[in-house]
Amino acid sequence: MRPDAVSVWKDTEVRERLSWYRQVMIGRLPAKFMLCRKIPTQVENSDASQEELWNEHASLSQQLCDLVKNVESGSESGWSLKDHHPNLLDLKGALVNRMLEHCNFCEWDCKVNRAEGKIGFCRLDRTTSVGSFFRHYGEEAPLIGVERKGGSGTIFFESCNCHCVFCQNWSISQPKTKMNIIGEAVTPVRLAEIAEELASEGAANINYVGGEPTIDLHTIVNSLTHMSTSIPLIWNSNMYCTMESMRILADLTDLWLPDFKFWRDECAKRLMWVGAKASYPEVVKRNHIFAAEHGSMIIRHLVMPGHIECCTKPILDFISETIGDKVLVNIMSQYYPSNMVPMNPEKYPDIARYPSKKEIQDAYDYARMLGLQFEQVS
């Protein structure tokens, strides 16, 4: 066990800002997806229109929000409530299945019928592929676990809705075609088995990562109906997803672990190949604000060489001005030229090097000046 995985919880700000996640991690409170089973639905999912499903979802989601508040305050016990069938979790499963038929999980909003085998911008049809899964000890200290729980139960999904030219995980995130996807094809049942296996080994959480998990939302949500272990769920995402996806996730996610890479849309378009249909920074800002109202959050910002003034400082300003009192921020210094950058340094001269010590220090100093809580997780 990493020593800081235990000592980090002595920090008052960490305990307060990650309170819900910690209570679920140590088993004092049930995970949100378990609480969804306590909320019954009267709508017959197979016969209802998608509009009717969303209307029912809005009503039940508010009930879940109230229940979470009561459980967290201690005025109600989540453990003693009985499960209902069908329930809010079943409703979410029906909704994501409908969404897959005109896919709008992410802001590319392809609207292709992936359920029938059509391929979206993500290069996926309905099949979900897992590249690997294991207990990860290199994540932020609060994710590693305490009290005999060890490692973050990371599940790496293949493919992505962004095509970052510098991606360090390009081998699984950027298959050239569907035929290049070589991971294990998983059903909801198999994905639940993977999560249960990680939990039985002592994982502190289930960490959905990639690639990008958003594009496999249908498999992930439906897998939760097959899980019996209460364990916190982490949504480790680029956050380039639609509000419909965010509403599905809000009632399931115990800890958000979002990226915020670029402030300027032109930087995102050039270096992430994203934003053609919807502005990357506008989407990500919207989703960060929404997520901060629905669970604990650690924001990741990768310091990019040459982008301190145009991106790093404005992103830190945004966090400080909107959600800085609710979140922790991991200011990451791990960037190195990868993927397409080393082969085309003349095309990407700004990021064809490591960030300098001064650039990293400038980012730290600026965050400190703004009063952001970053040192505990950076």
Residue ranges with predicted function:
Residues M1-L89, L95-V96:
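N-terminal alpha-helical interaction blocks
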Residues L64-F157, S171-Q174:
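N-terminal [4Fe-4S]-dependent radical SAM core
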Residues N104-F105, C162-F166, D254:
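C-type cytochrome heme c attachment motif
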Residues K118-V130, M179-E193:
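Short cysteine/histidine-rich metal-coordination sites, predominantly Zn2+-binding motifs
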Residues F133-I182, E193-V209:
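Long, charge-rich boundary regions
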Residues T187-P349:
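Conserved AdoMet/S-adenosylmethionine-binding subsite of the radical SAM
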Residues P345-Q361:
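Active-site-adjacent loop and "lid" segments of alpha/beta metabolic enzymes
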Residues I360-S378:
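A cross-taxonomic marker for long C-terminal extensions/tails that follow the last structured domain
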